[in-house]
């Protein structure tokens, strides 16, 4: 089986932690590095969260700090969902794990330029790191095999009626990525909201056990509370983990090719991913957009990854 080489670019909230856990353990994925961006919380907090997850699960992958601010807009955070730390819920041991000294954007550029065009970028937070890398060194564009991202929606947003948080947090960066010409796969809210993690799923992962089962439980029990308080949902969707699911087995997720444009005009639609689902604009599709996911398959995959952290010796 071919291992997909990926760089996981994240803002280290609750669903990001599940994505890290899956990407680092599944045999179909070769996780080269983790790059951190500001998003769910400020960069200092998202960096600590990423390092904490790696330390707890003994994930020996280099971690790089990236963009602390969006390209243009005023910074926003999602503390209503992810809490004051950006990863409220779990209690971690004192942190000894350290980030690399290289900036995430430089790491992305250098790694892609040295590659054979076989690396996939997996941004599951705001697209600031990816966009700045593209602008700093446009020669990386043909080197990117694919970008599989979590963000946007062809229906309703979750941070404004129009916009999903990751895109709204840096719409200008998203505009750069969506106009780059690189093959794009978008896991938007329409798809990711199908992965609502209800108490029975949490109990299933607790039964699976090990450090990842414990972390999953602590993370998703907190998310259960904030998702109900903010959106009335019966559980928290694990948005970002769907990107890892897609990379492991694209057949588990139905996609549709669409032309997608990011609205960067100020107003009520700022940050919206305008998806031409019906093809009325007549423009060539630039994105595969996630439509539906086989949730039985997906939770089975998550459990498989959780069990991978159980030590047998």
UniProtKB/Swiss-Prot annotation:
Keywords: Calcium, Glycosidase, Hydrolase, Metal-binding. One of its GO terms (molecular function) is calcium ion binding. Its cofactor is Ca(2+). Substrate binds at residues 227, 239. Its EC number is 3.2.2.8. The active site is at residue 11. It comes from the Bacteria. GO terms for biological process: purine nucleoside catabolic process; pyrimidine nucleobase metabolic process; pyrimidine ribonucleoside catabolic process. SUPFAM superfamilies: Nucleoside hydrolase (SSF53590). The keyword Hydrolase applies. Binds 1 Ca(2+) ion per monomer. Ca(2+) binds at residues 11, 16, 124, 240. It catalyses: a pyrimidine ribonucleoside + H2O = a pyrimidine nucleobase + D-ribose. GO terms for cellular component: cytosol. Hydrolyzes cytidine or uridine to ribose and cytosine or uracil, respectively. Has a clear preference for cytidine over uridine. Strictly specific for ribonucleosides. NCBIfam families: PRK09955.1 (NF007417). Belongs to the IUNH family. RihB subfamily. Homotetramer. This is Pyrimidine-specific ribonucleoside hydrolase RihB. It comes from Escherichia coli (strain SE11). The lineage of its organism: Bacteria, Pseudomonadati, Pseudomonadota, Gammaproteobacteria, Enterobacterales.
């Amino acid at each position: 089986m071919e291992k997909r080489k990926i760089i996981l670019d994240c803002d280290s909230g609750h669903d990001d932690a599940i994505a890290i856990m899956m990407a680092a353990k599944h045999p179909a994925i070769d996780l080269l590095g983790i790059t951190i961006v500001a998003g769910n919380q400020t960069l200092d907090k998202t960096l600590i969260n990423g390092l904490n997850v790696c330390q707890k699960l003994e994930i020996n992958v280099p971690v790089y700090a990236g963009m602390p601010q969006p390209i243009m807009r005023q910074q926003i955070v999602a503390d209503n969902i992810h809490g004051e730390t950006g990863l409220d819920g779990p209690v971690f041991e004192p942190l000894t794990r350290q980030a690399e000294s290289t900036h995430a954007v430089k790491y992305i550029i250098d790694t892609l330029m040295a590659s054979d065009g076989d690396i996939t970028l997996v941004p599951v937070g705001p697209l600031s790191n990816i966009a700045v890398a593209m602008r700093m060194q446009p020669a990386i564009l043909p080197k990117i095999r694919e970008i599989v991202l979590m963000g946007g929606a062809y229906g309703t947003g979750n941070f404004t009626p129009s916009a999903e948080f990751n895109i709204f947090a840096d719409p200008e960066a998203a505009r750069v990525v969506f106009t780059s010409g690189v093959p794009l796969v978008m896991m938007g809210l329409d798809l990711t909201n199908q992965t609502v993690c209800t108490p029975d799923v949490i109990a299933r992962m607790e039964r699976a056990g090990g450090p990842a089962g414990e972390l999953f439980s602590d993370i998703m029990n907190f998310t259960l509370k904030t998702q109900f308080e903010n959106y009335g949902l019966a559980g928290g969707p694990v948005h970002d983990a769907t990107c890892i699911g897609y990379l492991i087995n694209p057949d588990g997720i139905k996609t549709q090719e669409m032309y997608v444009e990011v609205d960067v005009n100020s107003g009520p639609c700022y940050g919206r991913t305008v998806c031409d689902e019906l093809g009325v604009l007549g423009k060539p599709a630039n994105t595969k957009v996630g439509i539906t996911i086989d949730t039985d398959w997906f939770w089975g995959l998550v459990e498989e990854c959780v069990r991978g952290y159980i030590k047998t010796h």
